[in-house]
């Protein structure tokens, strides 16, 4: 079978791929030392949405943009929804924020003070109200909660309070909505984090019910973690709800997905396909999303590169000859099984993807098309004055 014939067989699955982009990727970001401004950075959520729509226009891969509350707070979310739809995209996941208020210094959903816990719960109720207006499905919760020193907090008590708070929030989740709980092994807390790993997240969402899932951020693991195994396990348990794709060299670097280890991205996507999260045997509804900060590079090209990286590794993962791989595995042929796996990884699908795009009225090279479009120069000329959006 020729490479082109093999690609033709997987092309229909690529047609359905959607990678949600985060609104905050278009704003300024940085490290704990410095946030750098950049020309053309959005000043409003509408300008963020316009930039997200540009990514979708050139790639056909990003039909939704995630919101972050309160960073993207507006008076009229129904109008914001119409604005996005007029640009050809929709409003996606709503992300809560309980890490930038002084009241949450020692915890939010885990705090010992019931008034502060209720304040954090009420914020999530606000996010659910936003979802009702925007038509969003997923409420994503990442908690920057934990302790820095042994003895600082009651580990068991914090888990109990977290479970109670999540249960209260979950009661307000609609029948067509989902709660996804993200984990991160450290930072900003350094001794212990309240949701540090997939097991803790799974324990909480399993207790909540069938509309609660785990969000897996690829940068939120200790170095050397076998992330694809976690993917396989969560799909097996029916609790993988979404991805936050990014890349890392050391910690939670939030770099362009696939930049540090494209082979890892390939392995992850293979397990997504193998486990029914995407592709010919899909049974689970797993949302693909980026969570990245373009601290020094231009934001829109960074997002274009990111969604293309996910698409390319998805195509390669779909090309794995599953029948031959299974036969080699069952025969105990270690080297042949690895060879079959690596053959797919080393397949250069870029020319095939370029042709695939042209057949669908998209530019063969989205990055070159964007750079030649004049959009970047236009926003840099137009967005003068005002306060640039950013997470600080």
Show which residues each predicted segment covers.
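N-terminal pre-domain/capping segments
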Residues: 1-132, 313-392
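Active-site acidic/histidine proton-transfer and metal-coordination neighborhood
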Residues: 3-13, 90-91, 103-209, 213, ...
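Generic structural signal for well-ordered alpha-helices
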Residues: 7, 49-53, 77-84, 124-129, ...
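Hydrophobic faces of well-ordered beta-strands that scaffold small-molecule active sites
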Residues: 17-23, 31, 63-67, 89-96, ...
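Active-site beta-loop-alpha junctions enriched in small/polar residues
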Residues: 24-26, 68-72, 96-99, 144-146, ...
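Gly/Pro-rich active-site loop or hairpin
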Residues: 32, 36-43, 191-199, 221-308, ...
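A structural motif corresponding to the C-terminal end of an alpha-helix
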Residues: 54-62, 130-135, 168-179, 207-212, ...
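Structural recognition of alpha->loop->beta junctions
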Residues: 168, 200-211, 235-238, 309-323
């Amino acid at each position: 079978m020729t490479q082109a014939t093999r690609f033709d067989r997987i092309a229909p699955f690529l047609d359905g791929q959607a990678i949600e982009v985060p609104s905050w990727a278009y704003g300024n970001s940085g490290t704990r030392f410095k946030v750098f401004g950049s020309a053309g950075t959005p000043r409003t959520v509408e300008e963020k949405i316009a930039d997200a729509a540009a990514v979708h226009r050139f790639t056909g891969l990003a039909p939704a943009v995630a919101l972050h509350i309160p960073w993207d707070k507006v008076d009229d979310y129904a109008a914001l929804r119409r604005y996005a739809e007029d640009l050809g995209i929709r409003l996606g996941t709503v992300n809560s924020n309980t890490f930038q208020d002084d009241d949450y210094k020692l915890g939010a959903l885990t705090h010992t003070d019931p008034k502060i816990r209720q304040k954090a719960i009420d914020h999530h109720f606000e996010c659910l109200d936003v979802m009702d207006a925007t038509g969003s499905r997923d409420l994503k919760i990442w908690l920057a909660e934990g302790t820095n020193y042994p003895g600082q907090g009651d580990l068991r008590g914090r888990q109990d309070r977290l479970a109670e708070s999540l249960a209260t929030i979950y009661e307000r989740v609609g029948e067509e909505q989902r709660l996804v709980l993200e984990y991160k092994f450290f930072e900003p807390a350094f001794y212990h984090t309240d949701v540090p790993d997939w097991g803790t997240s799974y324990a909480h969402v399993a207790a909540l019910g069938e509309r609660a899932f785990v969000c897996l951020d690829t940068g939120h693991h200790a170095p050397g973690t076998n992330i694809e195994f976690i993917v396989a396990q969560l799909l097996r348990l029916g609790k993988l709800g979404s991805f936050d794709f990014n890349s890392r060299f050391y910690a939670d670097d939030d770099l362009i997905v696939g930049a540090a280890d494209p082979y890892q991205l390939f392995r992850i996507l293979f397990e997504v396909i193998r486990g029914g999260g995407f592709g010919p045997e899909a049974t689970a509804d797993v949302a693909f999303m980026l969570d990245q900060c373009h601290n020094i590079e231009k934001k829109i090209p960074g997002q274009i590169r990111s969604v293309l990286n996910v698409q390319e590794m998805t195509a390669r993962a779909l090309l794995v000859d599953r029948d031959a791989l299974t036969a080699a595995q069952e025969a105990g042929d270690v080297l042949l099984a690895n060879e079959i796996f690596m053959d797919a990884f080393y397949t250069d699908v870029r020319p095939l993807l370029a042709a695939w795009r042209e057949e669908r009225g998209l530019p063969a090279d989205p990055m070159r098309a964007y750079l030649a479009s004049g959009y970047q120069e236009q926003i840099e000329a137009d967005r003068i004055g005002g306060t640039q959006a950013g997470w600080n």
